[in-house]
Amino acid sequence: MNLIPMVIEQTNRGERSYDIYSRLLKDRIIFIGTGINDDIANSVIAQMLFLESEDPDKDIHLYINSPGGHVHAGLAIYDTMQYIRSDVSTICVGMAASMGAVLLAAGNEGKRFCLPNSRIMLHQPMGGAQGQAADVEIHAREIMKTKERLNQILAHHTGQPVEQISKDTDRDFFMSSEEAQKYGVIDDVLKRPPENS
Protein backbone atom coordinates (compact mmCIF):
# COMPACT_ATOMS: atom_id res chain seq x y z
CA MET A 1 0.00 0.00 0.00
CA ASN A 2 1.43 3.35 -1.07
CA LEU A 3 0.33 6.03 1.38
CA ILE A 4 1.29 9.61 0.55
CA PRO A 5 1.05 11.93 3.56
CA MET A 6 -1.02 15.09 3.30
CA VAL A 7 -0.10 18.40 4.91
CA ILE A 8 -2.50 21.19 5.79
CA GLU A 9 -1.48 24.79 5.31
CA GLN A 10 -3.30 27.84 6.66
CA THR A 11 -3.79 30.65 4.16
CA ASN A 12 -5.79 33.89 4.28
CA ARG A 13 -8.47 32.00 2.36
CA GLY A 14 -8.65 29.13 4.85
CA GLU A 15 -7.05 25.72 4.96
CA ARG A 16 -5.54 23.98 2.00
CA SER A 17 -4.27 20.41 1.91
CA TYR A 18 -1.38 19.23 -0.24
CA ASP A 19 0.26 15.89 -0.79
CA ILE A 20 3.71 16.12 0.81
CA TYR A 21 5.58 16.11 -2.51
CA SER A 22 3.60 19.09 -3.85
CA ARG A 23 4.30 20.98 -0.62
CA LEU A 24 8.03 20.21 -0.84
CA LEU A 25 8.03 21.39 -4.47
CA LYS A 26 6.94 24.84 -3.25
CA ASP A 27 10.28 24.95 -1.40
CA ARG A 28 12.13 23.76 -4.54
CA ILE A 29 12.66 20.28 -3.10
CA ILE A 30 12.39 17.15 -5.25
CA PHE A 31 12.57 13.75 -3.58
CA ILE A 32 13.63 10.47 -5.20
CA GLY A 33 12.71 7.81 -2.65
CA THR A 34 12.49 4.70 -4.79
CA GLY A 35 14.11 2.89 -7.68
CA ILE A 36 14.61 4.98 -10.81
CA ASN A 37 12.41 4.02 -13.75
CA ASP A 38 10.85 5.93 -16.65
CA ASP A 39 7.86 7.12 -14.60
CA ILE A 40 10.06 8.43 -11.78
CA ALA A 41 12.44 10.04 -14.29
CA ASN A 42 9.60 11.76 -16.15
CA SER A 43 8.20 13.11 -12.88
CA VAL A 44 11.60 14.37 -11.66
CA ILE A 45 12.41 15.94 -15.04
CA ALA A 46 9.03 17.70 -15.19
CA GLN A 47 9.55 19.09 -11.68
CA MET A 48 13.04 20.35 -12.56
CA LEU A 49 11.81 22.03 -15.73
CA PHE A 50 8.94 23.64 -13.81
CA LEU A 51 11.22 24.95 -11.05
CA GLU A 52 13.70 26.29 -13.61
CA SER A 53 10.90 28.15 -15.40
CA GLU A 54 9.71 29.60 -12.06
CA ASP A 55 13.16 30.99 -11.16
CA PRO A 56 16.32 29.85 -12.96
CA ASP A 57 18.54 31.65 -10.43
CA LYS A 58 17.37 29.67 -7.39
CA ASP A 59 18.78 26.28 -6.45
CA ILE A 60 16.80 23.07 -6.78
CA HIS A 61 17.33 20.61 -3.92
CA LEU A 62 17.27 16.96 -5.02
CA TYR A 63 17.01 14.54 -2.07
CA ILE A 64 18.00 10.96 -2.93
CA ASN A 65 17.22 7.70 -1.12
CA SER A 66 17.40 5.23 -3.98
CA PRO A 67 18.78 1.78 -4.77
CA GLY A 68 19.35 2.91 -8.37
CA GLY A 69 17.40 1.60 -11.30
CA HIS A 70 17.23 1.85 -15.06
CA VAL A 71 20.34 3.47 -16.50
CA HIS A 72 18.64 5.31 -19.36
CA ALA A 73 15.96 6.73 -17.06
CA GLY A 74 18.71 7.90 -14.71
CA LEU A 75 20.69 9.41 -17.57
CA ALA A 76 17.59 11.37 -18.63
CA ILE A 77 17.53 12.94 -15.13
CA TYR A 78 21.30 13.48 -15.29
CA ASP A 79 21.12 15.23 -18.67
CA THR A 80 18.31 17.47 -17.42
CA MET A 81 20.37 18.41 -14.34
CA GLN A 82 23.21 19.46 -16.63
CA TYR A 83 20.89 21.23 -19.08
CA ILE A 84 18.84 23.48 -16.81
CA ARG A 85 20.14 26.87 -15.67
CA SER A 86 19.26 26.34 -12.00
CA ASP A 87 21.96 24.85 -9.82
CA VAL A 88 20.98 21.44 -8.46
CA SER A 89 22.02 20.63 -4.91
CA THR A 90 21.99 16.89 -4.19
CA ILE A 91 21.48 15.42 -0.73
CA CYS A 92 21.68 11.69 0.05
CA VAL A 93 19.41 10.55 2.86
CA GLY A 94 19.86 6.85 3.52
CA MET A 95 21.19 5.22 0.36
CA ALA A 96 22.36 6.41 -3.03
CA ALA A 97 23.30 3.31 -5.00
CA SER A 98 24.06 2.71 -8.65
CA MET A 99 22.23 5.38 -10.70
CA GLY A 100 21.28 7.11 -7.44
CA ALA A 101 24.99 7.59 -6.71
CA VAL A 102 25.60 8.97 -10.21
CA LEU A 103 22.85 11.55 -9.66
CA LEU A 104 24.26 12.39 -6.23
CA ALA A 105 27.69 13.06 -7.74
CA ALA A 106 26.14 15.09 -10.58
CA GLY A 107 24.96 17.94 -8.35
CA ASN A 108 26.65 21.30 -8.76
CA GLU A 109 30.13 21.49 -7.28
CA GLY A 110 30.08 22.57 -3.64
CA LYS A 111 26.40 21.61 -3.35
CA ARG A 112 26.58 17.80 -3.04
CA PHE A 113 25.85 16.45 0.42
CA CYS A 114 24.85 13.41 2.42
CA LEU A 115 23.74 12.80 5.97
CA PRO A 116 26.18 11.14 8.40
CA ASN A 117 24.78 7.59 8.18
CA SER A 118 24.19 7.56 4.43
CA ARG A 119 25.66 4.79 2.27
CA ILE A 120 26.81 5.28 -1.29
CA MET A 121 27.39 2.41 -3.71
CA LEU A 122 28.94 2.49 -7.17
CA HIS A 123 29.02 -0.41 -9.61
CA GLN A 124 28.92 -1.22 -13.30
CA PRO A 125 25.56 -1.36 -15.10
CA MET A 126 23.69 -4.64 -15.17
CA GLY A 127 21.95 -6.05 -18.17
CA GLY A 128 20.64 -9.17 -19.73
CA ALA A 129 19.82 -10.24 -23.23
CA GLN A 130 18.29 -13.24 -24.86
CA GLY A 131 17.51 -14.21 -28.39
CA GLN A 132 19.69 -14.83 -31.37
CA ALA A 133 23.45 -14.81 -30.81
CA ALA A 134 23.88 -11.73 -33.01
CA ASP A 135 21.32 -9.80 -30.93
CA VAL A 136 22.98 -10.83 -27.65
CA GLU A 137 26.31 -9.60 -29.04
CA ILE A 138 24.73 -6.25 -30.00
CA HIS A 139 23.32 -5.84 -26.48
CA ALA A 140 26.67 -6.77 -24.92
CA ARG A 141 28.42 -4.07 -26.97
CA GLU A 142 25.76 -1.55 -25.97
CA ILE A 143 26.12 -2.26 -22.25
CA MET A 144 29.90 -1.89 -22.53
CA LYS A 145 29.41 1.53 -24.17
CA THR A 146 27.02 2.47 -21.37
CA LYS A 147 29.56 1.33 -18.77
CA GLU A 148 32.27 3.48 -20.39
CA ARG A 149 29.94 6.49 -20.49
CA LEU A 150 28.97 6.11 -16.80
CA ASN A 151 32.65 5.82 -15.86
CA GLN A 152 33.38 9.04 -17.77
CA ILE A 153 30.51 10.83 -16.00
CA LEU A 154 31.69 9.67 -12.57
CA ALA A 155 35.29 10.62 -13.37
CA HIS A 156 34.16 14.09 -14.47
CA HIS A 157 32.18 14.75 -11.27
CA THR A 158 34.46 13.07 -8.72
CA GLY A 159 37.85 14.07 -10.10
CA GLN A 160 38.96 10.43 -10.03
CA PRO A 161 40.77 9.03 -13.10
CA VAL A 162 38.57 6.93 -15.41
CA GLU A 163 40.89 3.97 -14.79
CA GLN A 164 40.26 4.21 -11.02
CA ILE A 165 36.49 4.48 -11.53
CA SER A 166 36.58 1.46 -13.86
CA LYS A 167 38.52 -0.58 -11.28
CA ASP A 168 36.31 0.47 -8.36
CA THR A 169 33.02 -0.14 -10.19
CA ASP A 170 34.00 -3.61 -11.39
CA ARG A 171 32.12 -4.91 -8.32
CA ASP A 172 29.80 -3.25 -5.81
CA PHE A 173 31.83 -0.46 -4.17
CA PHE A 174 30.27 0.78 -0.91
CA MET A 175 31.29 4.00 0.82
CA SER A 176 30.40 5.72 4.06
CA SER A 177 29.57 9.43 3.93
CA GLU A 178 33.16 10.33 4.87
CA GLU A 179 34.60 7.94 2.27
CA ALA A 180 32.26 9.39 -0.38
CA GLN A 181 33.53 12.87 0.48
CA LYS A 182 37.17 11.78 0.13
CA TYR A 183 36.35 10.02 -3.17
CA GLY A 184 34.69 13.16 -4.57
CA VAL A 185 31.10 11.90 -4.83
CA ILE A 186 29.97 14.58 -2.36
CA ASP A 187 31.40 17.84 -1.04
CA ASP A 188 30.34 17.67 2.60
CA VAL A 189 28.59 15.59 5.24
CA LEU A 190 25.62 17.51 6.64
CA LYS A 191 24.72 17.71 10.28
CA ARG A 192 22.31 20.60 9.62
CA PRO A 193 20.53 21.83 6.45
CA PRO A 194 22.66 23.86 4.00
CA GLU A 195 22.70 27.61 4.74
CA ASN A 196 20.79 28.73 1.63
CA SER A 197 17.91 26.26 2.05
From Swiss-Prot:
Q: Which UniProt keywords apply?
A: Cytoplasm, Hydrolase, Protease, Serine protease
In terms of CDD domains, this protein maps to: S14_ClpP_2
Q: Which reaction does it catalyse?
A: Hydrolysis of proteins to small peptides in the presence of ATP and magnesium. alpha-casein is the usual test substrate. In the absence of ATP, only oligopeptides shorter than five residues are hydrolyzed (such as succinyl-Leu-Tyr-|-NHMec, and Leu-Tyr-Leu-|-Tyr-Trp, in which cleavage of the -Tyr-|-Leu- and -Tyr-|-Trp bonds also occurs)
Tell me one GO molecular function of this protein.
Answer: serine-type endopeptidase activity
Q: What is the superkingdom listed in this entry's lineage? A: Bacteria
Q: What is its EC number?
A: 3.4.21.92
Q: Where in the cell is it found?
A: Cytoplasm
PROSITE patterns according to UniProt: CLP_PROTEASE_HIS (PS00382), CLP_PROTEASE_SER (PS00381)
* Main EC class the enzyme belongs to: hydrolase
Name the active site residues: 98 (nucleophile), 123
Q: Which SUPFAM superfamilies match?
A: ClpP/crotonase
Task: From the UniProt annotation, give the residues forming the signal peptide.
Answer: none
Q: Which GO terms describe its cellular component?
A: cytoplasm; endopeptidase Clp complex
Family annotation (Pfam families): CLP_protease
Q: Please, one GO biological process term?
A: protein quality control for misfolded or incompletely synthesized proteins
Q: Which family does it belong to?
A: Belongs to the peptidase S14 family.
Q: What does this protein do?
A: Cleaves peptides in various proteins in a process that requires ATP hydrolysis. Has a chymotrypsin-like activity. Plays a major role in the degradation of misfolded proteins.
UniProt cross-references to PANTHER family, sorted A to Z: ATP-DEPENDENT CLP PROTEASE PROTEOLYTIC SUBUNIT (PTHR10381:SF70)
Quaternary structure and interacting proteins, as annotated: Fourteen ClpP subunits assemble into 2 heptameric rings which stack back to back to give a disk-like structure with a central cavity, resembling the structure of eukaryotic proteasomes.
Entry protein name: ATP-dependent Clp protease proteolytic subunit
The organism of origin for this protein = Natranaerobius thermophilus (strain ATCC BAA-1301 / DSM 18059 / JW/NM-WN-LF)
Lineage, broadest ranks: Bacteria, Bacillati, Bacillota, Clostridia, Natranaerobiales
